[in-house]
């Protein structure tokens, strides 16, 4: 049986904290060193000095009405450049994420419990092309207080398969030792806590980088959708039209009187002045919106659960998904 998440700790990255989202220790790997930065290939979010496999940053999320989007775009024009991975006059691409969790959904519940330190295990692709040369990213995203620390490993889609995480000894060698370390750490944590596929999340992302900043990102997410899964399969072109997905950016999902966009600001420790002015000018209110937690809440409602007393989520029974 996997160990309790209340009793496992981290010896790499942020300090160890006893809570529901704590990362398992690496005691079984004496002398192992924490992942270090390495070069990131162009596909996927990255820029300048932040082209690392380990990124530490701050994030702020906002739910905004669609009518604000053109106004914010206009404000941003002097400060940003389009994400080169985006297509069209408005730089957009599709992001698909496979979320891993324990049978009791502890990683999803860590958000509701407001755990000071928590983490997510996810496998991510960009676009809908199933070309075997396209990349798959294994991401460990940690949040300690307000700081986001993300490590990732890149593998070609043609080498990805259902045995990679359960049996990391079968994984191919990646382009750098640092990425190999990140992949092994991802698999170690997933297997220690018994995490397996639980949810697919897909959305269209409009993305920009700060034109003169070491690391600053602006994203607008729309058509945010999910579907439950128990499979390691990463969907591609066959579901590019969102036909088999359940919407999340609805009034119910966003808890707003309108269906809106998820607007996000990302920066290093020195937040650009133009970002702070944007928040002030448009009177934006920060929200702790988590796509995975919202998908979990909506799915429980879809299956007939009711809201728990004093909880923004729903009542839960083990292995519900």
Show the residue positions of the predicted features:
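Phosphate-end processing signature that detects enzymes handling 5′-triphosphorylated RNA
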Residues: 1-321
């Amino acid at each position: 049986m996997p160990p309790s998440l209340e009793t496992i700790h981290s010896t790499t990255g942020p300090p160890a904290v006893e809570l529901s989202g704590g990362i398992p220790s690496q005691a079984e790997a004496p002398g192992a060193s924490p992942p270090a930065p390495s070069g990131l290939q162009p596909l996927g979010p990255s820029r300048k000095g932040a082209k690392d496999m380990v990124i530490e940053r701050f994030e702020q999320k906002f739910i905004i009405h669609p009518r604000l989007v053109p106004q914010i775009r206009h404000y941003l024009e002097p400060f940003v450049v389009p994400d080169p991975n985006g297509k069209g006059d408005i730089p957009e691409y599709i992001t698909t994420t496979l979320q891993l969790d324990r049978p009791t959904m502890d990683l999803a519940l860590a958000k509701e419990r407001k755990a000071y330190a928590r983490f997510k295990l996810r496998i991510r692709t960009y676009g809908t092309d199933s070309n075997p040369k396209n990349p798959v990213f294994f991401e460990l995203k940690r949040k300690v207080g307000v700081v986001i620390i993300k490590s990732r490993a890149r593998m070609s889609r043609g080498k990805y398969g259902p045995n990679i995480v359960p049996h990391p000894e079968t994984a191919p060698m990646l382009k750098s030792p640092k990425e190999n370390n990140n992949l092994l750490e991802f698999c170690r944590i997933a297997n220690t806590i018994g995490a397996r596929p639980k949810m697919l999340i897909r959305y269209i992302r409009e993305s920009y980088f700060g034109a003169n900043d070491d690391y600053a990102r602006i994203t607008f997410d729309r058509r945010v959708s999910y579907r439950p899964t128990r499979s390691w399969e990463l969907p591609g072109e066959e579901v590019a039209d969102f036909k088999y997905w359940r919407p999340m950016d609805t009034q119910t999902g966003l808890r707003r009187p309108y269906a809106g966009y998820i607007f996000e600001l990302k920066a290093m420790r020195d937040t650009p002045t133009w970002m702070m002015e944007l928040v002030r000018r448009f009177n934006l209110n920060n929200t702790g919106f988590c796509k995975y937690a919202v998908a979990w809440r909506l799915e429980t409602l879809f299956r007939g659960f009711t809201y728990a007393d004093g909880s923004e989520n729903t009542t839960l029974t083990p292995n519900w998904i």
